[in-house]
Swiss-Prot record:
Parts forming coiled coils: none
HAMAP family (UniProt xref): MetA_acyltransf (MF_00295)
Site features described as Important for acyl-CoA specificity, chain residue numbers: E111
Site (Important for substrate specificity): S192
Gene name tied to this protein: metAA
Annotated source species: Rhizobium leguminosarum bv. trifolii (strain WSM2304)
EC assignment: 2.3.1.31
Top enzyme category: transferase
Location(s), subcellular: Cytoplasm
Name of the protein described by the UniProt record: Homoserine O-acetyltransferase
């Protein structure tokens, strides 16, 4: 089944061109199937690019998915037009009465700020608490993952001496995990962050289990043994050129930045990078969506009632 998004959303045509099935409201109604309700809390400055990346992954599922785009209320986006936000987004205040089968919280370029210094931290805490009763399963990504694991488990983040930046080999630590079904023993994942969480802090909690890790970059994916929250600290959703875009952005503005590790062919920025993580990104999100489908109540309003 395809993903249901507005046909005027910029991502619509790109997804069609990429072979991702998308559907209109009319077709969705005709199928008479309850779609999985997936919310995307988009904290990234370039919201259009992030919409496409996430829609591409959740839309590849054989299940019908309805994606709702959500933003923090009162926070002005710097790189996305107000017209786009008004046309396609709702604030969390506007959707907090709803229940969602799945909920994605993205990263944000505010890693170096203490959580309490983030202007929308109080609302972020409210949203995280709300997911416990109104969301069946949550996928937290990069800063969103660090914020969530700090909020729920007190796991701190640490500033790195230099940016973790590039494509790094990771290990599958639990092949039997429902979220790693079909994963290779080793695989590559894009990394782009100034902070990290550490294994020692995560292992202090009996509720957390590390599923993916890199000998160079540390912890990548954590899940809650008895919960339905995933914490992805890197960027499996990235496009082939995402790291390149970040690199040249910093070079052109004079920001000190090293070339991304293991990314450009022959370490030559003039050569187009090859995407070596796409299949595992689809596996992870596909496994997550399938687990939601297998375990979520048929009546979406019953989500949270088993607590």
């Amino acid at each position: 089944m395809p993903i249901k998004i507005p046909d005027t959303l910029p991502a619509f045509e790109t997804l069609v061109q990429e072979g991702v099935r998308v559907m209109t409201e009319t077709l969705a109604i005709r199928q008479d199937i309850r779609p999985l309700q997936i919310g995307l809390l988009n904290l990234m400055p370039n919201k259009i690019k992030t919409e496409l990346q996430m829609a591409r992954l959740v839309g590849a599922s054989p299940l019908q998915v309805e994606l709702s785009l959500i933003r923090i209320g009162g926070h002005k986006a710097k790189n996305t037009s107000e017209d786009h936000l008004l046309a396609f987004y709702q604030t969390w205040e506007e959707v907090k009465h709803r229940k969602f089968d799945g909920f994605i919280i993205t990263g944000a370029p505010i890693e170096l700020l203490p959580y309490e210094d983030v202007t929308y931290w109080p609302e972020m805490q409210e949203i995280l608490d709300w997911t416990e009763t109104n969301v069946h399963s949550t996928m937290n990504v990069c800063w969103g993952a660090m914020a969530a694991i700090y909020h729920f488990h007190g796991v701190p983040k640490y500033e790195l001496k230099e940016k973790a930046f590039g494509v790094y080999r990771h290990r599958n630590l639990k092949p039997s995990s429902i979220y790693l079904n079909g994963f290779s023993d080793n695989f590559e994942v894009p990394v782009s962050r100034w902070t990290e969480v550490r294994r020692d802090d995560i292992e202090k909690s009996d509720e957390l289990e590390i599923l993916m890790e890199s000998s160079e970059m540390g912890v990548c994916l954590v899940h809650e043994k008895r919960g339905r929250r995933l914490y992805m600290f890197n960027h499996v959703e990235y496009d082939s050129t995402s790291l390149s875009d970040e690199y040249f952005r910093d070079v052109n503005t004079g920001v000190p930045i090293k070339m991304p590790h293991n990314y450009f062919p022959h370490n030559d920025p003039a050569l187009a990078p090859q995407n070596r993580w796409r299949s595992h990104a689809h596996l992870l999100f596909g496994n997550w969506i399938n687990e939601i489908y297998q375990t979520t109540p048929f009546d979406v309003e019953e989500i949270g009632m088993d607590l």
